[in-house]
Regions:
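Hydrophobic alpha-helical transmembrane segments
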Residues: 1-32, 65-164
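Solvent-exposed interhelical
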Residues: 27-72
Length: 164
C-alpha cells in the first residue's frame, strides 16, 4: 500500500487514502507469492535457523493456514470495497481468478506431502515452457506469479471501469 500511495503522490502531488485502500487486494496476492517461497523453503530455513512466519508452525503443511487466509482475504477484500462503496460491482471480475487460487493452494498441499510433485498442467500456467522438466519449486513460483499477474490485471481493469 505504501508503494501505491507513494506513486500516487509523485504523480498527483496529493495524498489519497483511496490509492492505499485500492492497493490492499493486490498487496495480498503479492504477499502470497512471497509467502509461498518461504513455505517451500520451510526445511532449509528451519535447518539454517532462519526465522520466518512459515517455520513458526510445526510443519510445512500446518504453515499453509496462512496461505489459505491470504487467499481468502484477497477475495473478500473486493467484496468489502464494493460494500463500502469504494469500487463498483466491476471489482468482482477478480473472482475469475479463484480457480487459479484454489489450484495454487492444492498444489502447495501436494508440495507439502511430496516436494518433487509437479502440478497438472493447465492452460493458465503459461508461460512455463517445458513445464514438466521445470523443478517443482519453480513451477509453484510460476503458479503464484501468474495468479498475482492475472488478479492485479483484473483489479486494474475494475478500477479503470469504475472511473468511467
Amino acid at each position: 500500500p505504501a508503494l501505491f500511495g507513494g506513486v500516487y503522490y509523485v504523480m498527483t502531488k496529493t495524498y489519497s487514502w483511496d490509492a492505499i485502500i485500492l492497493s490492499i487486494p493486490s498487496m495480498l496476492v503479492t504477499v502470497t507469492l512471497l509467502y509461498i517461497h518461504t513455505v517451500m523453503d520451510f526445511d532449509f530455513d528451519l535447518n539454517e535457523g532462519h526465522k520466518t512466519v512459515a517455520n513458526s508452525f510445526n510443519s510445512q503443511l500446518d504453515s499453509l493456514i496462512v496461505l489459505k487466509w491470504l487467499l481468502i482475504l484477497a477475495y473478500v477484500t473486493p467484496l468489502l470495497l464494493c460494500i463500502f462503496d469504494i469500487l463498483d460491482w466491476q471489482v468482482f471480475i477478480v473472482w475469475f481468478t479463484i480457480p487459479l487460487a484454489v489450484d495454487l493452494y492444492k498444489s502447495m498441499v501436494d508440495f507439502s506431502a511430496n516436494a518433487e510433485s509437479i502440478p497438472e498442467h493447465k492452460w493458465y500456467h503459461f508461460p512455463m515452457e517445458n513445464m514438466m522438466n521445470a523443478p517443482s519449486f519453480m513451477t509453484r513460483i510460476y503458479q503464484s506469479r501468474n495468479l498475482m499477474i492475472y488478479y492485479s490485471l483484473f483489479l486494474a481493469l475494475a478500477i479503470i471501469l469504475a472511473l468511467n
